Every structure is written in structure tokens, then in C-alpha cells.
């Protein structure tokens, strides 16, 4: 499956999935939490075959099913614990811009710079998602980091990665 991702200014993010059979699903994630899914029979089609709008909660439920999770009423304690964790832990996609101070730095170098309470779990580079990136991987303009951590640590890390054009 080929996956591409990009920003939609003022809207949110767009992620396109092209299957091995050549069909395509486009997911638009709005800043409001709303998700829109557009299904194309062929990746080259301009006309949508089918579309679907989901709330953030509906998306979570669908995602759990796609991951093969089976929810039983007896699992409510686990679900409550997961909800508590989700309030404390954030998954963030951080775009590396041309003025970012972490361009040309390896994952190992960034690991030493990042605040405590955050993990870099993936890098989206050249239209490929690299899960658990190698320490020697060097970041370039246009790469996107996937980071997981506590909200305050994520915010500090975003500030570290942000462009500092005025310096």
C-alpha cells in the first residue's frame, strides 16, 4: 500500500492510501476532529465512488475494528483506562520545514536534544513511513516526524523543531 500525506491549510491533513489493487482512499482530518473518507475505484479517477463523514469517536471505533480489536462489555475497565491515557498522551505529526534547526541531524542527535517524556516512533520520508527509525537516519526538509508523549513535552519538542527564521 502506498501512503502519502500533506497539509490542507485552514482545514487539517490529507492522507491518501493506494491499495495493491489500484483503488484509493483519501482521508481528510479536519482541525475540528471531523474525518471525511473518499473512496475511488481507481487511483487515477477524478470522480469519487463513495464518501463517508465520521466523528472523531466514530473514527476511533472504526480504527479499533480495522486493527482487529474485539470489544466486550466486560472490557469497560480497559476502555476507561485507555480513555484516561489518551487524555495524558498525544500523538503528533511534526513537519520539518526548510528553516528547522533539526534538518541534517540524525535521529540519534535528536534523541539527545528532545525533552524527556517524548518518543519518536516514526518518520514519513519520501512517501514512505519508517516505523522505529534507525538512529543513523538523517532528517531533511519535507520529512514528517511522528512523536508520542505527554502534552507539555510534545509542545516543547514542536518548539525545538520549529523554524527560527528571525535568528
UniProtKB/Swiss-Prot annotation:
Residues 79-163 form the RCK C-terminal domain. Its main location: membrane. GO terms for molecular function: monoatomic cation transmembrane transporter activity. GO terms for biological process: potassium ion transport. PROSITE patterns: RCK_C. Signal peptide: none annotated. It is a peripheral membrane protein. Interacts with AmhT. This is Ammonium/H(+) antiporter subunit AmhM.
Amino acid at each position: 500500500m502506498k501512503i502519502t500525506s500533506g497539509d490542507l491549510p485552514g482545514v487539517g491533513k490529507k492522507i491518501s492510501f493506494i491499495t495493491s489493487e489500484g483503488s484509493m482512499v483519501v482521508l481528510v482530518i479536519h482541525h475540528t476532529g471531523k474525518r471525511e473518507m473518499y473512496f475511488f475505484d481507481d487511483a487515477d479517477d477524478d470522480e469519487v465512488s463513495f464518501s463517508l463523514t465520521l466523528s472523531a469517536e466514530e473514527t476511533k471505533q472504526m480504527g479499533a475494528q480495522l486493527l482487529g480489536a474485539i470489544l466486550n462489555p466486560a472490557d469497560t475497565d480497559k476502555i476507561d483506562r485507555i480513555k484516561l491515557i489518551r487524555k495524558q498522551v498525544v500523538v503528533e505529526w511534526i513537519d520539518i520545514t526548510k528553516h528547522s534547526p533539526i534538518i541534517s541531524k540524525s535521529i540519534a542527535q535528536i534523541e539527545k536534544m528532545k525533552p524527556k517524556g517524548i518518543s519518536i516512533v516514526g518518520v514519513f520520508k519520501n512517501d514512505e513511513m519508517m516505523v522505529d527509525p534507525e538512529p543513523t537516519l538523517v532528517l531533511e526538509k519535507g520529512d514528517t516526524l511522528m512523536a508520542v508523549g505527554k502534552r507539555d513535552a510534545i509542545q516543547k519538542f514542536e518548539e525545538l523543531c520549529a523554524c527560527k527564521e528571525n535568528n
